[in-house]
Amino acid sequence: DWVGSLFSAYGAALDDAKGKITVDTPEVRQVLDYSKRLYAFLPPDVASWDNASNNKWLVSGKGALIFNPPSAWVVAKRDAPDVAEKLWTHAMPKGPKGRFAPLLPRYQGLWNFSKNKSAAKSLLVHINKPDNIRKLVAGAAGYDIPPYQKLLDYKVWDDQGPPPGTLSHYPNRGDQRNVMPCSPAPPPIASQLYTNAIMPKMMVRIGRGESIDKTLAWARSEIEGYSRQ
């Protein structure tokens, strides 16, 4: 997810909104050049990490920075309070084209064969009213973020600690904007790019010494395969 934000910060995309492959552009090359320099400072086994590895790395006291929701802080508060009180959530790094946070929206819907659609719709409308969203966000201790800016003025993020206010910049603040990873590619292609982790794999290939040209050729070949499906 954060690699998608990195691409957006440079104005880079692998596919445009019409499905045209845009792999070999100055912006994508900038991302790969930065990725190569960054990779030298990452843990040697980072490419084999699972979803919990970055949390464990940070809570162990060995790590200094991860890109993640505050689950690592929650674990540290429980298992390593001395680490938790030193953690702070802040905005994404800013690139030439701006500051972007990855957005992974979740949708609610009803089965078309449901036997009680009216009641189900009423429930969805009820739980999505601002006052109830506020209660749900508070119940999750601020972990789940509403997708709309007008719902980000809740005090829950400022009230969490230790340290006090550690989650205050977890929602978008200032000039940070949301971006869907792998956008603006058409959904059928974007879903393949995301599911197959094409952007992170490009970073790993560059970090392990592969040339930019070879990495771009590999990415193009992968995307061409998705475009034919």
Can you say where each PLM-predicted feature lies in the sequence?
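Glycine-centered hinge/linker elements that transmit conformational signals in sensory
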Residues: 18-48, 92
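Extracytoplasmic/periplasmic solute-binding protein
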Residues: 1-21, 27, 63-65
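Pocket-flanking alpha-helical
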Residues: 2, 53-57, 73-80, 224
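Short helix-initiation/N-cap motifs at beta->coil->alpha
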Residues: 45-60
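C-terminal lobe and pocket-closing loops
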Residues: 71-84, 95-197
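Short beta-strand and adjacent tight-turn residues that come in two discontinuous sequence segments
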Residues: 49, 67-69
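Conserved C-terminal helix/tail region of periplasmic/extracytoplasmic solute-binding proteins
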Residues: 175-229
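Non-transmembrane alpha-helical segments in soluble domains
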Residues: 4, 29-39, 55, 59, ...
